[in-house]
Amino acid sequence: MNKRMNELVALLNRYATEYYTSDNPSVSDSEYDRLYRELVELETAYPEQVLADSPTHRVGGKVLDGFEKYSHQYPLYSLQDAFSREELDAFDARVRKEVAHPTYICELKIDGLSISLTYEKGILVAGVTRGDGSIGENITENLKRVKDIPLTLTEELDITVRGECYMPRASFDQVNQARQENGEPEFANPRNAAAGTLRQLDTAVVAKRNLATFLYQEASPSTRDSQEKGLKYLEQLGFVVNPKRILAENIDEIWNFIQEVGQERENLPYDIDGVVIKVNDLASQEELGFTVKAPKWAVAYKFPAEEKEAQLLSVDWTVGRTGVVTPTANLTPVQLAGTTVSRATLHNVDYIAEKDIRKDDTVIVYKAGDIIPAVLRVVESKRVSEEKLDIPTNCPSCNSDLLHFEDEVALRCINPRCPAQIMEGLIHFASRDAMNITGLGPSIVEKLFAANLVKDVADIYRLQEEDFLLLEGVKEKSAAKLYQAIQASKENSAEKLLFGLGIRHVGSKASQLLLQYFHSIENLYQADSEEVASIESLGGVIAKSLQTYFATEGSEILLRELKETGVNLDYKGQTVVADAALSGLTVVLTGKLERLKRSEAKSKLESLGAKVTGSVSKKTDLVVVGADAGSKLQKAQELGIQVRDEAWLESL
C-alpha cells in the first residue's frame, strides 16, 4: 500500500502544479478526483502511512485554538514609497552614487498579505505572517490550505522564502456572494478578504476560499547572484512567481513599464497597487544596504489613489500621545477604494491654511497609501461659505494653552499631565508592536483610565484580576485572560518595552538596534549620546531624544517601578558585543559546512559581532567557506577579500 500511496501523492502533486502553477493541466478534473478519492481511502485505512506532502492536508477540517508568535530568522523590512517620476529619479540618483551602472528589475506589487515560508529538507515547516517584521504569527496550518503553496519542494534543501498571499478577484466575488446569501457582511475588498481568511481558526474555511500566492524573494542567503535568477530558481522549486516583470537600465524604461501596467491593471485577475523596483544584482544590494526601516536598493511606486468629492460637515480635534493636536474632517459619506468613508484626516493647522479649507467646503478625498482617508484639496468652484474653520487655542482634553512652534506644522499641548496624552501613551504601550498585551485595547484602556485604575504604564503591572471586574462588560473569564496577558508581557525582550515607552523618534527598529548594542535598558540609560549616535543606522536626533527622556526624573522613577513589578529590562535576542573578535565586520558564509549547521555558524558569527550577509561585495570584510564554495569564493579572491574555513570559525 505504501508504494501506491507514494505514487498517488506524486501524481496528484504533479497535476496540482500543472493546474495552479503552470495553468496547463494534463488530466481532466474527473480523473484528478478519482485518484484523490483513491488516496483518501488508502489514508483512511492506513493512517500511520500518510505522507507529509499528501494533498489531503489541504482540505481543512482542523479547528485551531489560536496563532502562536513566531520570531523571523530573517527580518522583513518595509519598502520606501514613491508616488511620482521625480521620486523615482531621486531613488536612481541615490543608487548611482554607490553603483555606477545599475540594472533594475521591476515586479508587480501585489495587494495582499506578506508571508514567510520556511522549508527544512524541502518540507514546509512554518508559514508566518509579516507581523512587525521581527515577530509574526504562525499560520502554517492555514497556509497549507492555499493550493499553490508547495508542501514539498523539488529539492531537499533548507530555505526561507517571501511572498504575497492574495485573493483572486473571481474568488472574492464568490466569497462575497456566499456571504450575501447567508446574511453576513461582505468584505470591502480582496485584501481584507484575504486577511480575514488567513486569520480564520477553522482551516476548512481557508481551504474553501481559494487564496493564491506569488513568491518573490529567497530570504535565507541565496546562491544566486541576481533577483532575476532568484525568481527563476523559485519557479524551479515549485513556487508560483509572477511572470509580469522586466529588467531596466534607466528610469525611462521603468516609467514606460509603470504606464503599461497602469493601463492593464483593471484587466488583471488580481489586485495590484503599484510596481516594485529593485537593483537586480545582489552584490550591489549588499553594497547599498539598509536604513533602519527599509532597503536602500528598492522602492515601491504606488499608483495614484482613487479620489471622490465630499462635503465638509465639521472638524474634530484630538490629542495624540506626543501632544500633537490633529484635525479630522467629518464628511458626507462616499465610497472610496471599496469602503465607506465619512471621516478623513486634515493633517495639521498648517495644512488647513495651505489648502485654504473653509466651513462647508466641497473637498476631494483620497486614501493616502490606499489606507488612510485624507482631504487632498478644496473644490473652489463649489464653495458656499467664506467663513474660516475654528482653530482651537486650548487643548481639547486638558484645556491648557496650545503652542505652535516655528519649526513645526502642528499645534501641540505640552502639559505632561494631559489626560489624552497619558491615555494614548497607555494604548501605545499595550499595542501589538510594543508590549503586545492581548485584549488590552483602546476600549479597556479608556475604562481603566476613567476608573482611575491606571495613571502610567507601571500601573498596568499593579492591576489584579478583580480590578477588571469593576469595568462595565468585563466578565470573570475575560478578566483572567487580561491578567494573564499582562503577566506574560513581563517576559518580553526589552526592545518591546523601549518602543512602548513612546520616546520621540525611537521606533521599533531603532529600539531593536539600541538593545542589540547595549543589551539592557539600564545600560542604555547609562550610555552617553555620542555612543548612541555612533551606532550604524541611528544618529544624533535619536541620541538627543533619548538623552532628553532619560534626563527627566520621571523616567528614572518609571524604570525603577517597572523593574520592581517584574518587567524584564534585558534584551533576549542576539546581542552585539562591541569589542568582540569580529565586531563591525561584514561576513559571508558560502559552501557546505561539515560540522556546523549554517544557522549555527550564522549565530556564532553574529555573537562575535559580525553582520552576516548573503552576497560578496566591496563592503564584505571576510568570507567563511565550506566545500563547493563556487562563485562567491571566486569573487572574494578577485576582490582580495580575506577567506577563512570552518575550522577557523570553530576555533574562535
UniProtKB/Swiss-Prot annotation:
- Which residue ranges does the record assign to the BRCT domain? 577-652
Q: Which residues form the active site?
A: K109
Q: Which PANTHER family match?
A: CHROMOSOME TRANSMISSION FIDELITY FACTOR 18 (PTHR23389), DNA LIGASE (PTHR23389:SF9)
Reaction(s) the record says it catalyses: NAD(+) + (deoxyribonucleotide)n-3'-hydroxyl + 5'-phospho-(deoxyribonucleotide)m = (deoxyribonucleotide)n+m + AMP + beta-nicotinamide D-nucleotide
Regarding protein family, the annotation reads: Belongs to the NAD-dependent DNA ligase family. LigA subfamily.
Species, as recorded: Streptococcus pneumoniae (strain 70585)
EC number annotated for this UniProt entry? 6.5.1.2
Q: What protein name applies here? A: DNA ligase
What the protein does?
DNA ligase that catalyzes the formation of phosphodiester linkages between 5'-phosphoryl and 3'-hydroxyl groups in double-stranded DNA using NAD as a coenzyme and as the energy source for the reaction. It is essential for DNA replication and repair of damaged DNA.
Q: What class of enzyme is it?
A: ligase
Q: Where along this sequence does the record place binding of NAD(+)? A: D29, S30, E31, Y32, D33, S78, L79, E107, R130, E164, K278, K302
Which GO BP terms apply? DNA repair; DNA replication
Gene name of the encoded protein: ligA
The cellular component terms of Gene Ontology attached to this UniProt record, alphabetical and capped at eight, are:
cytosol
Gene3D superfamilies with a match to the protein in the record: 5' to 3' exonuclease, C-terminal subdomain, 6.20.10.30, BRCT domain, DNA ligase/mRNA capping enzyme, Helix hairpin bin, Nucleic acid-binding proteins
